[in-house]
Amino acid sequence: NVFQEGAASLLGEDDYEFVGPLPPSAFSEEDRILYDLIAKFESAGSYDAVNVLWYPSGKGGGAFEISSDLNATFEGSKISELSFGKIKKLQSTYFTVRYPKTKPANSFFAMGKFQVIPKTMRLVRANMDFSDSDIYSPENQDRIIEFLIYSGKKRKKLSNYLLNVGSTTLDQAQIDLAQEFSSVPQPNGSSYYGNETSHHSSETIRTALKNARDANKKNGRTSY
Protein backbone atom coordinates (compact mmCIF):
# COMPACT_ATOMS: atom_id res chain seq x y z
CA ASN A 1 0.00 0.00 0.00
CA VAL A 2 1.65 3.21 -1.19
CA PHE A 3 0.01 5.35 1.48
CA GLN A 4 1.08 3.08 4.30
CA GLU A 5 4.64 3.06 2.99
CA GLY A 6 4.58 6.86 2.87
CA ALA A 7 3.30 7.08 6.42
CA ALA A 8 5.92 4.63 7.64
CA SER A 9 8.60 6.74 5.99
CA LEU A 10 7.31 9.88 7.71
CA LEU A 11 6.85 8.42 11.17
CA GLY A 12 9.05 5.36 11.39
CA GLU A 13 7.94 1.75 10.92
CA ASP A 14 7.13 1.10 14.58
CA ASP A 15 5.41 4.40 15.30
CA TYR A 16 2.38 4.09 13.06
CA GLU A 17 -0.31 1.48 13.38
CA PHE A 18 -3.26 1.43 11.00
CA VAL A 19 -6.49 0.13 12.48
CA GLY A 20 -9.56 -0.58 10.39
CA PRO A 21 -10.19 -0.33 6.66
CA LEU A 22 -8.88 2.38 4.38
CA PRO A 23 -11.74 2.86 1.90
CA PRO A 24 -10.84 4.06 -1.58
CA SER A 25 -11.05 7.80 -2.13
CA ALA A 26 -9.62 10.67 -4.13
CA PHE A 27 -7.45 11.82 -1.22
CA SER A 28 -3.83 12.53 -1.97
CA GLU A 29 -1.29 10.44 -0.11
CA GLU A 30 -0.33 13.53 1.89
CA ASP A 31 -3.93 14.22 2.90
CA ARG A 32 -4.45 10.62 3.91
CA ILE A 33 -1.33 10.71 6.08
CA LEU A 34 -2.63 13.85 7.81
CA TYR A 35 -6.08 12.35 8.35
CA ASP A 36 -4.75 9.10 9.76
CA LEU A 37 -2.37 10.98 12.03
CA ILE A 38 -5.41 12.77 13.44
CA ALA A 39 -7.30 9.50 13.84
CA LYS A 40 -4.39 7.63 15.43
CA PHE A 41 -4.96 9.07 18.90
CA GLU A 42 -8.57 10.17 18.45
CA SER A 43 -9.86 6.67 17.72
CA ALA A 44 -6.92 4.33 16.97
CA GLY A 45 -8.21 4.62 13.41
CA SER A 46 -11.49 2.83 14.14
CA TYR A 47 -14.61 3.92 12.27
CA ASP A 48 -16.64 2.40 15.14
CA ALA A 49 -15.02 4.27 18.05
CA VAL A 50 -17.13 6.25 20.53
CA ASN A 51 -16.64 8.29 23.68
CA VAL A 52 -19.23 9.08 26.32
CA LEU A 53 -18.50 12.04 28.60
CA TRP A 54 -20.02 13.15 31.86
CA TYR A 55 -19.07 15.82 34.38
CA PRO A 56 -19.52 15.01 38.09
CA SER A 57 -19.25 18.72 38.90
CA GLY A 58 -21.85 19.57 36.29
CA LYS A 59 -19.57 22.07 34.60
CA GLY A 60 -17.40 22.04 31.52
CA GLY A 61 -13.71 22.78 31.45
CA GLY A 62 -13.04 20.90 34.69
CA ALA A 63 -12.75 17.26 35.66
CA PHE A 64 -14.74 14.83 33.57
CA GLU A 65 -15.26 11.09 33.30
CA ILE A 66 -15.01 9.25 30.01
CA SER A 67 -16.05 5.85 28.73
CA SER A 68 -14.45 4.74 25.46
CA ASP A 69 -15.06 1.86 23.08
CA LEU A 70 -13.05 1.37 19.88
CA ASN A 71 -15.51 -1.18 18.48
CA ALA A 72 -18.85 0.10 19.66
CA THR A 73 -22.24 -1.19 18.59
CA PHE A 74 -25.79 0.00 19.17
CA GLU A 75 -28.78 -2.30 18.93
CA GLY A 76 -26.63 -4.90 17.18
CA SER A 77 -25.12 -2.60 14.55
CA LYS A 78 -21.63 -1.16 14.33
CA ILE A 79 -21.33 2.62 14.57
CA SER A 80 -20.27 2.67 10.91
CA GLU A 81 -23.52 0.88 10.03
CA LEU A 82 -25.86 3.35 11.74
CA SER A 83 -27.90 5.96 9.88
CA PHE A 84 -27.26 9.66 10.34
CA GLY A 85 -30.74 9.85 11.83
CA LYS A 86 -29.74 7.36 14.51
CA ILE A 87 -26.46 9.22 15.10
CA LYS A 88 -28.40 12.44 15.61
CA LYS A 89 -30.62 10.77 18.19
CA LEU A 90 -27.67 9.22 20.05
CA GLN A 91 -25.94 12.61 20.33
CA SER A 92 -29.07 14.60 21.16
CA THR A 93 -28.64 14.20 24.93
CA TYR A 94 -25.74 16.65 24.85
CA PHE A 95 -27.91 19.37 23.36
CA THR A 96 -30.47 18.88 26.13
CA VAL A 97 -27.91 18.62 28.95
CA ARG A 98 -24.46 19.70 27.76
CA TYR A 99 -22.71 18.69 30.99
CA PRO A 100 -24.48 15.62 32.40
CA LYS A 101 -23.39 14.77 35.95
CA THR A 102 -23.79 11.04 35.41
CA LYS A 103 -23.13 8.81 32.42
CA PRO A 104 -26.06 9.30 30.03
CA ALA A 105 -27.79 6.15 28.81
CA ASN A 106 -28.06 5.35 25.09
CA SER A 107 -25.91 8.36 24.28
CA PHE A 108 -22.58 8.99 22.60
CA PHE A 109 -20.55 12.20 22.55
CA ALA A 110 -17.72 11.72 20.03
CA MET A 111 -18.32 9.20 17.27
CA GLY A 112 -16.33 7.49 14.55
CA LYS A 113 -12.79 7.57 13.26
CA PHE A 114 -12.52 11.34 13.62
CA GLN A 115 -14.52 11.57 16.86
CA VAL A 116 -17.14 13.99 15.57
CA ILE A 117 -18.91 15.67 18.49
CA PRO A 118 -22.58 16.78 18.51
CA LYS A 119 -21.98 20.45 17.67
CA THR A 120 -19.66 19.56 14.81
CA MET A 121 -22.07 16.91 13.53
CA ARG A 122 -24.79 19.56 13.41
CA LEU A 123 -22.49 21.74 11.27
CA VAL A 124 -21.78 18.77 9.01
CA ARG A 125 -25.47 18.04 8.54
CA ALA A 126 -26.21 21.70 7.79
CA ASN A 127 -23.57 21.88 5.07
CA MET A 128 -23.32 18.43 3.52
CA ASP A 129 -25.88 16.40 1.62
CA PHE A 130 -26.47 13.61 4.15
CA SER A 131 -30.05 12.55 4.80
CA ASP A 132 -31.28 10.82 7.96
CA SER A 133 -31.32 7.53 6.06
CA ASP A 134 -27.73 7.79 4.84
CA ILE A 135 -25.20 5.64 6.68
CA TYR A 136 -22.32 6.86 8.84
CA SER A 137 -20.08 4.61 6.78
CA PRO A 138 -16.29 4.70 6.46
CA GLU A 139 -16.69 6.43 3.11
CA ASN A 140 -18.97 9.10 4.55
CA GLN A 141 -16.75 9.58 7.61
CA ASP A 142 -13.88 10.23 5.21
CA ARG A 143 -16.01 12.80 3.40
CA ILE A 144 -16.59 14.51 6.74
CA ILE A 145 -12.90 14.86 7.59
CA GLU A 146 -12.29 16.34 4.15
CA PHE A 147 -15.07 18.85 4.82
CA LEU A 148 -13.74 19.75 8.27
CA ILE A 149 -10.17 20.23 7.08
CA TYR A 150 -10.73 21.92 3.73
CA SER A 151 -14.13 23.64 3.56
CA GLY A 152 -13.24 26.57 5.81
CA LYS A 153 -16.69 26.40 7.40
CA LYS A 154 -15.17 25.85 10.83
CA ARG A 155 -11.36 26.16 10.58
CA LYS A 156 -10.68 28.86 8.01
CA LYS A 157 -7.02 29.40 8.88
CA LEU A 158 -6.32 25.69 8.52
CA SER A 159 -7.97 25.44 5.11
CA ASN A 160 -6.34 28.64 3.86
CA TYR A 161 -2.90 27.37 4.84
CA LEU A 162 -3.38 23.98 3.20
CA LEU A 163 -4.77 25.55 0.02
CA ASN A 164 -2.05 28.22 -0.17
CA VAL A 165 -4.62 31.00 0.14
CA GLY A 166 -3.65 34.29 1.78
CA SER A 167 -0.88 34.67 4.33
CA THR A 168 -1.88 32.16 7.03
CA THR A 169 1.15 30.75 8.82
CA LEU A 170 1.92 27.17 9.78
CA ASP A 171 1.56 28.08 13.45
CA GLN A 172 -1.93 29.48 12.85
CA ALA A 173 -2.97 26.39 10.90
CA GLN A 174 -1.65 24.07 13.60
CA ILE A 175 -3.51 25.95 16.32
CA ASP A 176 -6.71 25.67 14.26
CA LEU A 177 -6.17 21.92 13.96
CA ALA A 178 -5.42 21.63 17.69
CA GLN A 179 -8.68 23.43 18.45
CA GLU A 180 -10.56 20.83 16.43
CA PHE A 181 -8.76 17.73 17.75
CA SER A 182 -7.54 17.58 21.34
CA SER A 183 -4.89 14.93 20.57
CA VAL A 184 -3.14 17.36 18.20
CA PRO A 185 -0.59 19.65 19.87
CA GLN A 186 -0.18 23.37 19.47
CA PRO A 187 3.20 24.60 18.18
CA ASN A 188 4.54 24.58 21.76
CA GLY A 189 3.59 20.91 22.16
CA SER A 190 0.67 21.35 24.56
CA SER A 191 -2.98 20.56 23.96
CA TYR A 192 -5.20 23.56 23.24
CA TYR A 193 -7.52 22.17 25.93
CA GLY A 194 -6.00 22.50 29.38
CA ASN A 195 -7.82 19.48 30.80
CA GLU A 196 -6.56 17.12 28.09
CA THR A 197 -3.19 15.92 26.80
CA SER A 198 -1.85 16.06 23.26
CA HIS A 199 -0.30 12.82 22.03
CA HIS A 200 1.57 13.63 18.83
CA SER A 201 4.88 15.44 18.62
CA SER A 202 4.46 18.95 17.29
CA GLU A 203 7.04 18.32 14.57
CA THR A 204 5.16 15.29 13.24
CA ILE A 205 1.99 17.35 12.80
CA ARG A 206 3.88 20.26 11.27
CA THR A 207 5.56 17.97 8.76
CA ALA A 208 2.22 16.47 7.73
CA LEU A 209 0.64 19.91 7.32
CA LYS A 210 3.55 21.20 5.26
CA ASN A 211 3.54 18.10 3.06
CA ALA A 212 -0.20 18.40 2.40
CA ARG A 213 0.17 22.10 1.57
CA ASP A 214 3.09 21.41 -0.78
CA ALA A 215 1.15 18.65 -2.53
CA ASN A 216 -1.82 20.97 -3.07
CA LYS A 217 0.44 23.63 -4.53
CA LYS A 218 2.08 21.10 -6.84
CA ASN A 219 -1.31 19.78 -7.96
CA GLY A 220 -2.83 23.24 -8.40
CA ARG A 221 -5.51 22.72 -5.77
CA THR A 222 -6.84 26.00 -4.36
CA SER A 223 -10.35 25.12 -3.14
CA TYR A 224 -12.41 22.55 -1.27
What do these predicted regions represent?
Residues 2-135, 140-224:
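Cell-wall polysaccharide-cleaving catalytic domain and substrate-binding groove, primarily
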